[in-house]
Curated annotation (Swiss-Prot):
Keyword Transcription recorded: yes
Taxonomic classification: Eukaryota, Viridiplantae, Streptophyta, Embryophyta, Tracheophyta
Record-given protein name: B3 domain-containing protein Os07g0183200
Superkingdom: Eukaryota
UniProt entry keywords in alphabetical sequence: DNA-binding, Nucleus, Transcription, Transcription regulation
Keyword Plastid: no
DNA-binding region boundaries: 124-227
InterPro entries attached to this UniProt entry: ARF_plant (IPR044835), B3_DNA-bd (IPR003340), DNA-bd_pseudobarrel_sf (IPR015300)
Disulphide bonds in the chain: none
Record-linked SUPFAM superfamilies: DNA-binding pseudobarrel domain (SSF101936)
Length: 407
């Protein structure tokens, strides 16, 4: 894969830029908010990032439901975890008071794309299986995946040194070779694997920024974990770095952020993109468009990803809504997806859209898609539609008793 070079979202560690962040993020995820934009911060989503079962943590909050806050983005910094080598975004948010909502400025325009022909970030992702870290002393990947990222082998029958840096710039020299139609990394791989304490489902991301005719760009490796580590890493390779924060400390960060948000105080959250649709800092426009949806049980929907503001959405699998939770905002839809989709059955209402049958006969004009500035939000909160004998409310009407005044 290749991604066009782009500037940092803000000052960060200096190595991780927007391209590297997106490469390390879950596929079709990892959207970063623009500085100055208006977003919703979902506490439940923040907790779910660190806890497989977040309910006990949420019960400790002194914040009443639905635990969602309107904020402006003060800063976005891209960093790498000092020990786990995960890329993450540090997002600083300013809560918006109810009386300030009408005076909010429009969202800033998306940053222009980088000019073509410059440096490209080429990368590939390998999701690790048990055999990759329990038995093998070497890493292997299909040659087709590694092409354009790993350099060509000088001698296909011999190994050669390959310098790879982690996301902090620390170098590792692997024995780079070939076995059949696969490339292999040995020597340092076992130590790197043991120090990272990988589990089944974790991923490694190899990245190289290079010109089209240059094979000498620096090679980096990042990590995407399936879930937060529940115990400290052994830390044998990086003795000078701090130990992994225990689960309790990570959970304290969620509680502190929720407390600051409720008090109207500036706070900072760390966002690690680990699975599709896990963003808990969501653009206001996306949430409000979802609030206009009219969904019922058994309604057919399709999942929609929006990786970058201003980019066309990516449409995912279809499914049917089987339940709509009335006591929560985060992942309040239960959906059975078609086929063998591995999508989470719980989805957020702004991540799906109804599948509608459109009459394309010449006598029927195409439906008009309103721009954000054309939508009368007060009308959308009060209008319902006929569904046979049933009045189908908007999502906003379903949730207006739960959501704060400033939503």
């Amino acid at each position: 894969m290749a991604a066009a070079a782009a500037p940092l979202a803000d000052d960060g560690d200096g190595i991780v830029d927007r391209d590297m962040w997106l490469a390390c993020a879950a596929p079709n995820s990892g959207r970063l908010p623009a500085v100055g934009s208006v977003v919703f911060y979902f506490v439940d989503g923040h907790a779910a990032q660190f806890c497989q079962f977040p309910a006990p943590l949420l019960e400790q909050l002194a914040v009443p439901g639905p635990r969602v806050f309107l904020c402006t983005v003060a800063a976005v910094r891209l960093r790498a975890d000092a020990l786990t080598n995960e890329a993450y975004a540090e997002i600083t948010l300013d809560p918006v008071a109810d009386h300030d909502v009408p005076r909010l400025a429009p969202a800033p325009a998306p940053a222009p794309a980088a000019a073509a022909g410059g440096q490209q970030l080429r990368y590939f992702v390998k999701t690790l299986m048990i055999s990759d870290f329990d038995f093998r002393i070497r890493f292997s990947a299909p040659m087709a995946d590694a092409k354009g990222v790993f350099p060509p082998l000088v001698d296909a029958k011999a190994v050669q040194p390959l310098l790879v840096k982690d996301l902090h710039g620390s170098p590792m020299t692997f024995d780079y070779g070939r076995k059949g139609k696969r490339v292999t990394l040995a020597k340092v791989w076992k130590k790197f694997r043991d120090d990272m304490d990988f589990v089944d489902g974790d991923s490694v991301i190899f990245m190289r920024r290079r010109d089209d005719d240059d094979d000498d760009g620096e090679l980096y490796v990042g990590v995407r974990r399936q879930r937060t580590l529940e115990r400290p890493l052994r830390n044998t390779m990086r003795r000078y770095r701090p130990p992994t924060p225990p689960q309790a400390a990570v959970q304290e960060a969620v509680l502190a952020a929720a407390g600051h948000a409720a008090a109207g105080e500036r706070f900072t959250v760390a966002y690690r993109s680990r699975k599709d649709g896990d963003e808990f800092v969501v653009p206001r426009e996306a949430v409000e468009e979802g609030l206009r949806a009219r969904l019922t049980s058994l309604a057919e929907v399709e999942f929609v990803w929006a990786v970058e503001d201003g980019a066309p959405p990516i449409v995912g699998p279809r499914g049917k809504v089987t339940a709509i939770a009335t006591g929560q905002l985060w992942r309040n839809l239960e959906i059975v997806w078609d086929g063998n989709s591995e999508m989470d059955m719980s989805a957020n209402f702004w991540q799906v859209r109804p599948v509608e049958e459109v009459d394309i006969s010449p006598s029927t004009p195409p439906p008009k898609r309103l721009k954000n500035c054309e939508i009368d939000d007060t009308a959308s909160t009060s209008v319902s539609v006929d569904n046979g004998d049933e009045q189908v409310p908007t999502m906003r009407q379903r949730l207006e008793a739960l959501i704060p005044d400033n939503i």
